[in-house]
Amino acid sequence: MRTNPTTSSSVVSTLEEKNLGRIAQIIGPVLDVVFPPGKMPNIYNALVVEGRDTVGQQINVTCEVQQLLGNNRVRAVAMSATDGLMRGMEVIDTGAPLSVPVGGATLGRIFNVLGEPVDNLGPVDTRTTSPIHRSAPAFIQLDTKLSIFETGIKVVDLLAPYRRGGKIGLFGGAGVGKTVLIMELINNIAKAHGGVSVFGGVGERTREGNDLYMEMKESGVINEKNIAESKVALVYGQMNEPPGARMRVGLTALTMAEYFRDVNEQDVLLFIDNIFRFVQAGSEVSALLGRMPSAVGYQPTLSTEMGSLQERITSTKEGSITSIQAVYVPADDLTDPAPATTFAHLDATTVLSRVLAAKGIYPAVDPLDSTSTMLQPRIVGEEHYETAQRVKQTSQRYKELQDIIAILGLDELSEEDRLTVARARKIERFLSQPFFVAEVFTGSPGKYVGLAETIRGFQLILSGELDGLPEQAFYLVGNIDEATAKAMNLEVESKLKK
């Protein structure tokens, strides 16, 4: 960690002696630069090209050294468009890797891969910066205790609990509630854990990034009037950016998250959307650098690149980084090297279902497809484990009976199966929950439900104590007491109508 100005030009101006090179070759986003003998920059050093193009436009391109070619030449990958660059232009070696601003001043702001604000709200009020390339925490620094990261979302905490300092894969198509779930997690970690969040948009659509920013402002996750009260920092490397920017934007977001963990000693949520785009950008850079492709055309260093990112996402004795990563599966092929490499690092998967979303059950988390390595009796306890297993068994039996119900109707089922269906429908509805960030859209106040309350609620449904209550009483409520109160209100309303 060091303190210095954040812009590339001011970093350069503070260097006592500039190490200057010249561009020898430009191949799209890749530059070959010649330096004087004995003054070669190190791998991952940031190089800056400043000057004017043929029509007098100012050029300021930052590159990262990727290869030392010999004959005093290095090969670097540009972090922005190389339009206007020419052979012979002067290149300055900054003598250090890319550094980005960190700390509380980053909250509520949008950054690019270089840590420059792109939200037209002026410069960032911090002089503390950190290099994006760092080693993962040493083994002795790690907190190896297995503990649950409580989210306050019933379906997640009960059936696919997150690990503190773990990595979660978020699977879901368009329009099933990924963004709302992400925003609720950001909101809940701030309220329940006093934590903050960092969102890394890796190779995503500009429109989606803009929509997320607008929705965060609307729901209060980003506070426009008092930016210091915001709960999230956003880092975007969009689809139209060069591959170098898309490959490094995940590291920029992670570096900001590491500061909150290591210096502020906070619990941090790190969102990466989409982890596949990180791999894709690495593949493009690998091809541009002339490396021999590996399986399915991916880079030969796929596992190393993924590991260097994922191993920095962990719990230490100071705090934790819990990462939620959207995973795109190319052609729905789970054996593709990109998702297959990602799966090796995941502790839990949260699968969003379009069928549940169509029924109006939000969050539309599929209780049967979502998994977690934390759902073991020795970690969560016998009571939690038994309740979760019984909920899954009841839901699975209901799923098996749906074809029979569709053809023959409920009346043809046995008494036991009818009871199972009734309880499964109550469970399905009780897995829904009103969100704080959706208050402005639904008018229903959001609910944070503790794990103990969640377990108690499902135990009461499974035991049959609530068999007499109507299933609509369980829809979009917090804890089980609210469902009981809602049932009484429904009964009063029905009597008044009569």
Swiss-Prot record:
Query: Which sites bind ATP?
Result: G172, G173, A174, G175, V176, G177, K178, T179
Catalytic activity annotation? ATP + H2O + 4 H(+)(in) = ADP + phosphate + 5 H(+)(out)
Q: Tell me where on the tree of life, at the top rank, the source sits.
A: Eukaryota
Biological process annotations from GO:
proton motive force-driven mitochondrial ATP synthesis
Task: Supply one GO CC term from the record.
Answer: chloroplast thylakoid membrane
- UniProt-annotated location(s): Plastid, Chloroplast thylakoid membrane
Documented EC number(s): 7.1.2.2
Q: How does it sit in the membrane?
A: Peripheral membrane protein
Could you tell me which cysteines form disulfide bridges?
none
Task: Give a yes or no for keyword Chloroplast in this entry.
Answer: yes
Extract the Pfam families matched here.
ATP-synt_ab, ATP-synt_ab_N, ATP-synt_VA_C
MF annotations from Gene Ontology: ATP binding; ATP hydrolysis activity; proton-transporting ATP synthase activity, rotational mechanism
| Keywords carried by this UniProt record | ATP synthesis, ATP-binding, CF(1), Chloroplast, Hydrogen ion transport, Ion transport, Membrane, Nucleotide-binding, Plastid, Thylakoid, Translocase, Transport
Q: Which SUPFAM superfamilies match?
A: C-terminal domain of alpha and beta subunits of F1 ATP synthase (SSF47917), N-terminal domain of alpha and beta subunits of F1 ATP synthase (SSF50615), P-loop containing nucleoside triphosphate hydrolases (SSF52540)
What this protein is reported to do is described as:
Produces ATP from ADP in the presence of a proton gradient across the membrane. The catalytic sites are hosted primarily by the beta subunits.
Family note: Belongs to the ATPase alpha/beta chains family.
**Quaternary state and interactors:** F-type ATPases have 2 components, CF(1) - the catalytic core - and CF(0) - the membrane proton channel. CF(1) has five subunits: alpha(3), beta(3), gamma(1), delta(1), epsilon(1). CF(0) has four main subunits: a(1), b(1), b'(1) and c(9-12).
What protein is this chain from? Answer: ATP synthase subunit beta, chloroplastic
